[in-house]
Amino acid sequence: MTATSNSAPLAGGSLSSSATAQPPQPPPGHQQQHPLPQIYDSQMQYYYGSSMPNQPIPTYTAQNGAPQQFGTPPYYQDANGQFGQVPAQQQMMTAGHPYFYMAQPQQGGQHVAQSGQPQIFYYQQPLGQMAQQAAPMYFHPMQAASTPMLSEQMSMMPQIQSTNPQQSEQLRKSGAQISTTRTVPLTSSTPLPTSREYETVQRDRNRNSQSRYQCPIEHDDLPIDEISKITIDNHNDDTMSAEKENRFNKNRVEKLGRRGFAKPEVDSQLPHNFKTRLCMTHAAGINPCALGARCKFAHGLKELRASDIPTRYPNNKYKTKLCKNFARGGSGVCPYGLRCEFVHPSDTEFQNIPPYQRKMVEEHDSIPEDYVVARYQPRFMHTSGKATTPTKVTLKQRNVAGSMMCLSNTGRDLEAGGDFNHPEINENDLPPHLRRIRRGNPPVTRSRPSFSTKWTSVENLGLRGHY
């Protein structure tokens, strides 16, 4: 059995005859088991496996808890003819494999110069599953450098050498590695890495790949000091919000003190109107306030505080005009509610506004009429949220009534004033600009023409009009 030792050596002490026990001399004639001439590289080092009898060391030892069994530490013979024991941490031969790698022997920090001829490699006891061979194993160096050989391919190498070209072609189709070039011993010009060096290379490669593509860090990979800085932000919690607000005020006071300003009290940092009015959402009691402790309005009488600043300058026009949302064309709903500065129908100031504004509210709340045959149509049509009852008038009656209305002068009033231009309307109920018009041009009472027919009568049509 053959082996090569071209892997990188591990750091260790010198392997000399004085440091290790000298094994007995190998049996004579062991080197004469190679009758055929071989091709060797003068820069490489070769080892032949053989057993050393009468050694009480066990045949196999398990390393690193691996299920496979490895051979016991062997001895080697240097150029001076001295025997040295291979360290136990070196990679051992696996039972059933045709070769293994070993580090070159060292003396201190220097490699031991070996001759180009093969060296005999002695085992303390024979390995049962390893059959001895008279000649070293041959393989192509490019195959070992390009792809690693599996254990099944390694065991097939002795069989491949004895096959003919036809069998080699069949094995090549099955996936076996076969070399048709000149064979050389199991050597390599580059030392093979050890297990520790291989792990170091893999670790560096993984580090480079992560720095290039910047893989995300899992939560388990975060340092402990960074995990301690992670906090839970319950912004909806009243207690947490109050603590955060107090901490913010405290930090603000400290920053002002470091900049040379006088440190004001914490209460002076709050707005002057903070918690001076009740929160309408909280006072309604329907839904809780979403702001919680961060709300600037008072949640109850306990939080309500008196303001130290004087009240604002009074607004002389406060609650003196009707809100446009309740006038003609309005929606009937004010989004400002009690905060609106205009008069609502539910306010006590509603009785203080002019009568014409109150009439606009009454018209807004009244049910709209069908003005098809009415005498006076309103200038501003509006819609209401209330459902109207349709007037039961047939299409024939509408057409006849419309044609008769065109013959009379009672269809509509074309003069200025609209609905307010009637003699029976009180002057106090008119807007200011219409009052001035009425004083200059009083309304003229019109008489109904004599040829008015029954089709203009509201009683016959079932309608109500302003006559």
UniProtKB/Swiss-Prot annotation:
Residues 1-22, 179-195 have a biased composition (Low complexity). InterPro entries: ZFP36-like (IPR045877), Znf_CCCH (IPR000571), Znf_CCCH_sf (IPR036855). The modification Phosphoserine is found at residue 457. One of its GO terms (cellular component) is P granule. It is found in: Cytoplasm. Residues 196-207 have a biased composition (Basic and acidic residues). Its main location: cytoplasm. A zinc finger (C3H1-type) spans 273-302, 317-347. GO terms for molecular function: DNA binding; mRNA 3'-UTR binding; protein domain specific binding; protein kinase binding; zinc ion binding. SMART domains: ZnF_C3H1. GO terms for biological process: regulation of protein localization. PROSITE patterns: ZF_C3H1 (PS50103). Disruption phenotype: RNAi-mediated knockdown in mex-5 zu199 mutant background causes a loss in plk-1 asymmetric distribution during the first embryonic cell divisions. It comes from the Eukaryota. The keyword RNA-binding does not apply. Interacts (probably when phosphorylated on Thr-190) with plk-1 (via POLO box domain) and plk-2 (via POLO box domain). This is Zinc finger protein mex-6. It comes from Caenorhabditis elegans. The gene is mex-6.
